[in-house]
From Swiss-Prot:
Contains 3 disulfide bonds. It comes from Lychas mucronatus. This is Venom protein 29. Expressed by the venom gland. One of its GO terms (cellular component) is extracellular region. Keywords: Disulfide bond, Secreted, Signal. Residues 1-18 form the signal peptide. Its main location: secreted. The lineage of its organism: Eukaryota, Metazoa, Ecdysozoa, Arthropoda, Chelicerata. It comes from the Eukaryota. It is found in: Secreted.
Amino acid sequence: MNKLFLFTLLVTLWSVKGFTYEEKKQAFCSLPKVYQIRLLDCLIDRGSENDKEVVNAVYKCMNEHSDVDGKADAMMKAVCNEEIFATNRNLILCMLVNPPKLEHSERTNDDDLEAVKYCLVNG
């Protein structure tokens, strides 16, 4: 029952635009790691090409300069452990040298919100 309540709360957090990025991040980072990874795997699969470029760039650098278990784990650590960038100069340099190649996208915030809702419910 607690898991159902938690997922319902997260769907509400992402659906209501009144919550700040920090509040959403705090809710996400308080999830057990297994649910964070599951949610991120789904979001990566359903993300835009630009989203995938960012994920690939973060994963490449995190994999070279930190201990990660895949793309979702790299993103989870980048979002929930921001101090990793403050304490690892090689990671920062890698991100500066290998920025993601972003292109114009017709994808809207509503498309992203639908992906988040889908992954929170079906993830």
